[in-house]
Amino acid sequence: MGQKVNPNGFRYGITKQHNAIWYAEKKDFSKFLLEDQKIHQFFEKLVRQYLIGKVEIKRDQKGRVFVGVHSAKRGAMLGQEGKNIQTLTASLQKFLRQKNKDIKIDVINIDQPELNARLLAEQIAVDLENRKPFRIAQKFAIRNSLKAGAKGIKTAVSGRLNGVDMARTEGYTEGEMKLHTLRQKVDYAQATARTTYGAIGIKVWVSLGEILDGGKQ
């Protein structure tokens, strides 16, 4: 029987770079891993506000933490003269309960948010929460992504669609989507829409073509 695997985890270390890049001794590993989880939780709350598509974490030997935040609203996230990013850094230190922690947040602009699976999934979630029909919400995201240059896109929504009693899954696929080909550059993300009928899960796969030179993206 065929088993499904997360397309991101399937490609990490092969054609996709890990989101966390650091080394730690055995005694520190669990502490750093928990810190990473908390950093992701912190930015999870800001995804829709700043259109955050990806968060990368790096550490050096001196214990400094470098957080790379990929955002489609770079200007809004930085704020006037970088004041907002200073506030976010202080809030993150407080969230981690380490006010003296050396943290540097770098905001990287997302030029084409229509090709980012996370942002597409969140957009579908927002549309569903605003009572837009699930078919129209998916087709709108697919059309925008293909128009922006995606080679293929696949979407799926699951739950009490349109408020019916029995939950089901419906989705669409357009263009090429070679999930078994490791050199195929596939971006995958999940999101949840909180509707009056309950939670609806959203999955989005975006194919950006093949990586032929063996380089990691």
UniProtKB/Swiss-Prot annotation:
GO cellular component, as recorded: cytosolic small ribosomal subunit
Superkingdom, taxonomy of origin: Bacteria
Transmembrane annotation, as ranges: none
Keyword list, A-Z: Ribonucleoprotein, Ribosomal protein, RNA-binding, rRNA-binding
Coiled coil: none
Gene Ontology biological process terms in this record: translation
Domain KH type-2 positions: 39-111
Pfam family, one: KH_2
Disulfide feature: none
SUPFAM superfamilies: Prokaryotic type KH domain (KH-domain type II), Ribosomal protein S3 C-terminal domain
GO terms, molecular function: mRNA binding; rRNA binding; structural constituent of ribosome
Function: Binds the lower part of the 30S subunit head. Binds mRNA in the 70S ribosome, positioning it for translation.
Family: Belongs to the universal ribosomal protein uS3 family.
Assembly with partners or alone: Part of the 30S ribosomal subunit. Forms a tight complex with proteins S10 and S14.
Matches recorded under NCBIfam families: rpsC_bact (TIGR01009)
Name by which UniProt lists this protein: Small ribosomal subunit protein uS3
Organism: Mycoplasmopsis pulmonis (strain UAB CTIP) (Mycoplasma pulmonis)
Gene name for this UniProt entry: rpsC
